[in-house]
Every structure is written in C-alpha cells, then in structure tokens.
A protein has these predicted regions:
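Sec-dependent N-terminal signal peptides
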Residues: 5-16
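Phosphate-group recognition and catalysis centered on beta-loop-alpha active-site segments
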Residues: 8, 20-256
Length: 256
C-alpha cells in the first residue's frame, strides 16, 4: 500500500512540475500578432492584436534613420527604401500590407500606452557603434518620457548596443542578447537578463537553459512556430517563447 501511495505521489509531483513549467512560459508575439486579418508585421494593428489575445509581450524592430529619427521596421531595406540612409519621411511613406504607413517609434509607443502588453524592443544592428549609441540614447529617453520604462524590455544582436542598453537604461531593465554566441556565464558577466537565442542554439546546448536559471537569468527562444518545438521548450522550462503563431502556443500552454 505504501509503495502504491508513493508511486501515485510521484506521478502527481511530475504532473504538477510540468504544469508549473507551462504556467511559467510566456508568449511573445514576433513582430506583433500579424498572421490575422487586418494586420501586418510590425504594424500598430499587430501590436493591438497581440494585446487583444493577452500576449505577455509584442516584439518589434527599430531603426535610426539618416536624419536621426526612430522608426519601426524589420528589414534594413524594405520596399526599396534603405532605413539607415533614408529620412523619416521617406521611411514612413512606405505602405504596409494592411494599408498602414510604416510607423515611427513615437506613434507605436503612443498606441502602446493604451494597452497592457509588454514591449519587446529590438534595436537592429547598425553600420557603426556611434549610430547605435545615438539610437539607444534616444530610445531610452523616449521610453522614459512616455512612461513605458516599466513595460519595456530590450533585445539586440549587436554586442555594442546590448552593452549600451545595460549602461543607459534604468537599473533592472531587462536586456537580452540575440546572437547566440555567448555562454550563460558570459551573459551574466555582461549584466544581461539572459539569452534570447534561436531555437537551434538551445537544441545544441540544452544545458544552457538550466545554467541560466541557476545564475538567476531568464531564457527566451525564437522564432518558434512548430508545435513539437514549443512542447520541447516548455518541457525544458524556458521562460518565454517568441513566435509567429501566438494562438497555437497559447492553446498548447492551456492543455498543460
């Protein structure tokens, strides 16, 4: 009888542990929730729609234009316009697939103030460190001025920009590194909140997830659109999954 009780207790413990892991994994909509009617990548509509389905965060990309303005866009060259060497006016004249104009960061944040989802701001890697420093300074200043510092997290592939966010953002602001070439120990030494690495990096180094947690950091994986990969990451206990399929991920988490 005792052995039977111990067996069932063990099963319940394992099940409860899996449930806790699932509850701890948060959904980040990659470039917003854009795979739905009336939306487009990095559009204001995508931000609103990510908020409407209660995503933890909505990820978006930022460039500094030739006239030192901040705009929201992923590609360095989009619809024939090169972001770094074009003016704000030239960039924002681009029409997105849902009919919106490409937004400025200020426009994007103005809408975000009306919402609850967290802002996962990626600064794109620019041609020079000087450009990145100017961009970081402007971003941090704008975020603070608009009262969004407590809801904003920063991510970047650039080592320089990463260190600048850590240096210039308010103490305790989460800053994650994207490239995938630094160990958990190195990220901790930098002062990062943790890695935001491609799924393939964690497949190669699954031990890094536990190492990060042991060091007090959090773990984000991108861009995860396959159900099996989502299941694996949830089982490994990652804190965040960035996806183009936020509804699918939410459904999987609900079943846990």
């Amino acid at each position: 009888m005792k052995l039977k009780k111990l067996f069932f207790a063990s099963i319940l413990t394992i099940a409860a542990y899996g449930t806790v892991q699932a509850q701890n994994t948060q959904v980040i909509a990659h470039r917003g929730f854009w795979k739905t009617d009336g939306s487009a990548q990095n559009s204001i509509a995508a931000l609103v729609k990510a908020d409407s389905i209660n995503c933890y965060g909505s990820e978006f990309d930022v460039w500094l234009t030739a006239d030192n303005k901040l705009i929201v866009d992923h590609d360095g060259v989009f619809k024939g316009v090169r972001m770094e060497t074009s003016t704000e006016k030239e960039c924002t004249s681009i029409i997105l697939n849902n009919g919106e104009n490409l937004p400025t960061l200020k426009q994007y944040l103005s809408k975000a103030k009306q919402l609850k989802t967290r802002l996962i701001l990626e600064l794109k890697a620019h041609k020079t460190p000087e450009q990145e420093t100017r961009a970081v300074k402007q971003i941090v200043k704008m975020i603070k001025k608009m009262g969004l510092a407590d809801r904003t997290e920063y991510i970047t592939f650039s080592r320089h920009a990463c260190k600048e966010f850590i240096r210039l953002a308010p103490k305790g602001t989460p800053v994650y590194y994207l490239e995938g070439d630094l160990s958990p120990k190195e990220l901790k030494e930098w002062g990062c909140a943790g890695p935001d690495y491609h799924l393939s990096v964690f497949k190669k180094h699954p031990e890094w997830i536990k190492e990060c947690h042991d060091l007090g950091m959090k773990v984000n994986a991108w861009t995860v659109n396959d159900a099996k990969d989502m299941e694996w990451l949830i089982g490994e206990g990652v804190d965040f999954i960035t996806t183009n399929e936020p509804v699918l991920l939410q459904e999987i988490l609900k079943r846990k």
